[in-house]
Amino acid sequence: MTQLVKEGFSELISNLKQVLGNENVLSSEDDLKFYSSDVFKEAMLASLVIVPNNTNQLSQAIEISTRENYCVIPRGGGLSYTDSYLPKKNNSIIVDMQKLNNIIEINEDDMFVVVEAGCTWDHLYKVLKSKNLRTPYFGALSGLFSTVGGAMSQNSIFFGSGIYGSAADQCLGLEVVLADGSIIKTGSWATPHNPSPFFRSYGPDLTGIFLSDTGALGFKTKIVIKLIPFPEFTDFLSFSFKDYKNIASSMSKVSRAGIAAECFGFDPYLQGQRLKREGLLKDLKSLANVAKSGESVLAGLKDAARVAVTGRSIFKDVPYSMHVVVDGDSKSSIQSSIEKVRAIVIPENGEEIEPSLPKIMRANPFSPPNSMLGPNGERWVPIHAIVPHSRAKKLLEVVHNFFDEKVDLLEEHKIEWGYLLATISNQGFLVEPVFFWEDSRF
């Protein structure tokens, strides 16, 4: 680094500290290494990490940084594995968004919530539940730490996705800081007269430009999400299948029927990994929450007892498992949906089993992200594809054939694999292969 460049960098740091405070401009090697890696890999080190407390600080910091030709990169909870916030150039500044974590407004009349991008799904879920409200899609499995802004940037799925789709499908409007530091709003929030962020389709869909972009096109600072009443009743089904073709067919049919808030499945290997990983302490906590989640104290205790009795042994002889969660506003509507699922799945050779897993997952939707390592500390990374239902079985066939051809290579490098399946609204089918392997320190 030349003297002139050093002086310019020192001035940049000084200017950023004036805006953000000394403690919110990080430059130690330890900090830079931590922030310059995601779940999958490390990248070249960022030049700096900055941690704004609010939108105005962020706006000023971005304007200062880009004026000096530095790339600025948003980072949420740091739980992605897609290179989205990893530096690609030497002059990069990572922006930690986690201090922008407030819930700004819960509008029960117009049924939307305004939340800052650094808020976690776990926090949002708990606050809304206390008001008997929920967002339609309500978070990824990593929602204990993953942020709303990260989900909108990555377009994540899981809880609620079977009916309501992905994270981006729930968004009504955004506040965004652009590369020059200017601040814009989208949707009906952008109108100059009595703005209210209740409606996304206000002119051209500028909201969509900033969704599913991994943060590349702007810094989402505030996000407006639809609200629905918290479901009064929930019920569960699980099924065992002998082959992947039947489970894929069943999941697609359930998805097309539009009756499952969540519809997901595991292959034998990934199912086994999940069961190995969970500890007794986690099980006890899960059982307590299963008991609390029943429609009455007695019903909750009965549910917890069934889960305790069947436990993990229910999966001992299950090749492929499919799990369904059904929400509704009455017992009769729930029962109708449950019977529709059975009518779809049983002719596909699905054998009904105790739905312990979906009960536990709904009772504790945001568990610690211990799935980011194998049960013995192995490295972990998933990849995925989303296809229309008409291509789901073919994609699984291609996946199986590919790995069958790579058996020797997988054994040589001690790589094991499995996959998660999930449906997205009526149209999408997700196949997510997951890899486990011993890294260089084993």
Role assignments for model-derived ranges:
Residues M1-E63, L79-M111, K359-V381, G418-F429:
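N-terminal flexible segment immediately upstream of the FAD-binding catalytic core
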Residues L48-N53, L227, D235-S240, V324-V326, ...:
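Short, well-ordered beta-strand elements within core beta-sheets of diverse protein domains
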Residues N54, L79, M111-F112, C119-L124, ...:
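Short, structural beta-strand-to-alpha-helix junction motif
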Residues I103-I106, A117, D122-I259, C263-G265:
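FAD-binding subdomain of flavoenzyme oxidoreductases
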Residues A248, S252-F442:
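C-terminal substrate-recognition/cap domain of FAD-linked oxidoreductases
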